[in-house]
Amino acid sequence: MIVNGLGLGSFMRRSGSGNSNRASASASASASASTLLPTSSKMDYVKLQPRIGSTFPPPHRTQLPPRFHSSLTSGGLPPGAGRSACHRNWWILIPALLLLFFFFLFFTLSGQFSAKISPVQNYKYGIVIDAGSSGSRLHVFRYTAEGKMPSVDTAGGDKLSLKSKPGLSSFATSPEKAGKSLLKLLDFARQKVPEEERAKTKLYLMATAGLRRLDLKIQDAILDSCREMLQRSGFLFRNEWASVITGTDEGLFAWVAANYALGTLGGDPDETAGIVELGGASVQVTFVPRLLPPEEFLIKLELGGVTYKVYTYSFLNLGQEAAWEALLQLLFTRVVRTSLPSASDGVVVDPCTPPGYVMSEEEIHRRSTKFGTTSELEISSVLSAGNFSECRSAALKLLQMGREACTYERCAIGSTFIPELRGRFFATENFFYTSEFFGLPATTSLADVEAAGRHYCAESWSKLQEIHKGIGQEDLLKYCFSTAYIVALLHDSLGVAMHGKRMHFTNRIDNVPLDWPLGAITVKLAQENHQRPALSRLRDSFITIFSFLVLGAITTQCSFRLKAIMSSGEVPLTS
């Protein structure tokens, strides 16, 4: 502090010289008094008090013994004490602030560079059970959580996943047995996760369309059975982590998985790819559109510091198996008729099954009962026609059902809004399995899919069985319908060009499986990482505030000490 060009030390030095002069005068006065008064008549200084209304001023401090000096001065500090005390405080403050600075610097840099400087990755683990309609698949993920985006180790691939059958939905009549179906999967997980990490490894069970189609009470009963088993697994599990996820979640997770594999997350949203999944029970369409869709179709997702505005929708009962079953029902109930001739009204013409296949009477009766066929529409036989064009037309009618209720500008499937597709897309699951069966490359066109389907549908059933001896009957039956359904869905409904290369039929990107569980664990970890910077900011704010409080406290203390010294008369206010 500088006053009138003089530093704090100048004031303290001037105060010290004044005090010494006054002290000498006081000593002389005391000596004179002691020679004039006898000991018995000396003034009792203890009882000396100023009288109220007295015209005499109170005694000067030099008239009092030293023990009274502290009671009549503010702080009673000796000359130079304020300066030395403040100096001592500053010598304490400077190392403290330096220590706080290095503490802040260490934690900031360690969070950014620890993964780079450490030769050994300290992996953490997470587990996701995909409880699908045909079976349950367990995925073990290894990851590190440094940076804005988690780093999931995808090198393990299939070695870190295992599938078991049947699916949880098959326990609808005996839900209490569902939990035991997970034993094999949990044993597999224990082999992959180190023992010391198991209690810290989060375990999620996410059921999809297979369980979504069941009654809510049955869903809860099946999940409760699974929860009991998962609680005893040795992994970190909470009851709410076993749930039936929505089709929207499933589509979003698949989109995250695809773009994580591409390395586009955390960058420009327009550079991301879209994804269309053809599952067994449902279809998911997810991508970042050019224009914002209606609010009910929009999801805002923050990943890597970037907010993505994603369109996603799940079409329940339009997955490959569910759609085929639904189409047969439409044929059996005459809701959909083909232009192909039939021998009689009791004969159903099936354009999606290769010619020569004969449906047994038991199968016809089962389907007639299931579909609620009336006696007037009693089915005597099913004629397998194997006609690609008619099958495609029937599939399109199925996809367009309910379009008359559309209230949006554009309804591509039923009465549901779908924006115009943009950018590249990945067609996964049954899209890929069908293209793989026909030996088509990932960049195949829909025209190639159509050509393969036409040839397959027209081939006799006996010839197909002879050519594909290693494939089961149920699988062979579906490929005529599958090719026609793919063209009806992607071209006739979503507007994908027949000869374009926009669609990539694959389940992998750079050997990374495009499984939605990868997206699910990525989103979960990103949410946890999003909370960590908030805690880091809170820590940094605490350090800053604490530093200012220490500085303020010492400065205030020095200020009060200086004022006390000045008010006591030790420091002259004028030179």
Go through each PLM region and give its residues.
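Helix-loop boundary elements of multi-pass alpha-helical membrane proteins
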Residues: 69-95, 123, 563-574
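Hydrophobic alpha-helical cores of multi-pass transmembrane domains in eukaryotic membrane proteins
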Residues: 96-103, 131, 548-552
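Membrane-lumen (extracellular) interface motif
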Residues: 107-121, 266-268, 563-564
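A short acidic Gly-Thr/Ser loop motif
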Residues: 121, 129-137, 276-282
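Beta-propeller domains
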Residues: 147-156
